Amino acid sequence: PYGPAAGPNTQLAQNIIAAYAAGSRFFEVKTVQVMDGEELSKCVSKPCITAADECYNCEWSTELYVPQAFAEYVKAWFACKLLAKELELGDPDGFVFNMSVGYDLKGIQSPKVDAYIEGMKDASGTEVWRECMDWALANLDRFEKVDEAYVRGITPHVSNSITESTLHGCPPDEIERIATYLITEKNLNTYVKCNPTLLGYEFARKTLDGLGYDYI
C-alpha cells in the first residue's frame, strides 16, 4: 500500500478522505509535538512550504492544537470506514493510519502528546468518537450499504503504529531513546524517519537523480 507522508496534506480530515478515495491506503498523519497552536505559529512562520512541483517536506508539526489534530484524524478514520463500505472502495480494514510524533523524548512523554498517543490507540472514550458515532447512527437513511451493526462495529483503535520524527542534528542516542520508549512503553510498531536533511546531501542528491528528479 502507498499513501501520503506526514505534511499539510494529512492535517485535515477532508484531505485524508480525498487521498483515501483516490486510492491511498497508508496514511502518516501530520506530526504532533508538545509545542502547538499559537505558540508554534509565533516560532515558525506558516505555511512554510510552497511548491508547484515535487519538493522537500522539512516542515514542522501540525498547525493545529494537539487535541484539534486528534479530532481531525478520528473524523477521517470514521469517514473512511463509512466510505469504504458505502462506495465499495475495498476492505474497510484495508487501510492504516500511522501516527507521527516529535521531536524529543521529553516532549513525547508530556501529558499532551501522551494523551494524543493513547487516544489514537483507543478513541472509544473520547468526545469526538462519540460525535462521529452519533452522527452516523442518526444519518443511516443517507446510506444504502451502511447499517447500524456496521457503524457500531467500527473499531476505535485508530492506530497501533507510529513514526518517530526528529530534527536534523538530533543526537543518535536520543533517536534510540525515543524509539525504545515507543516500542517498549507504548507498545507501538515504530518507524524511524530518515528525512533528506538527516541523510546528507550526497545521498539525497544521488537518490533523487536515480529516480529521475534531476531537475530539483
Which ranges hold each PLM region?
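Active-site entrance/lid segments in N-terminal catalytic domains of soluble metabolic enzymes
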Residues: 1, 5-216
